[in-house]
């Protein structure tokens, strides 16, 4: 899993996302089919959505300024850590 995530995120976003997850900043994680939504508490509360496709993440969105510029952010990484820590049918 780590090698896969290293292709999705830069190391700083991955490390910060892991820290957000470990500090319990991922809240209201929900699954509807292959779509996940969550709120991540950062400098503000950011909405994160991701679509899971067979064996990979299809698309990810976040309301933070960094993601709005087309980047994959620490909030997205935090949600992936949260998903991987739970038993979801994907």
What are these regions (language model features)?
Residues 1-90:
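Long, low-complexity, compositionally biased intrinsically disordered regions
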């Amino acid at each position: 899993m780590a090698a896969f995530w290293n292709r999705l995120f830069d190391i700083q976003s991955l490390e910060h996302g892991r820290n957000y997850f470990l500090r319990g900043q991922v809240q209201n994680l929900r699954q509807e089919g292959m779509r996940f939504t969550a709120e991540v508490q950062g400098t503000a509360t950011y909405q994160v959505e991701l679509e899971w496709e067979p064996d990979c993440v299809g698309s990810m969105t976040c309301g933070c300024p960094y993601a709005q510029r087309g980047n994959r952010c620490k909030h997205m990484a935090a949600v992936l850590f949260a998903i991987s820590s739970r038993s979801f049918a994907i």
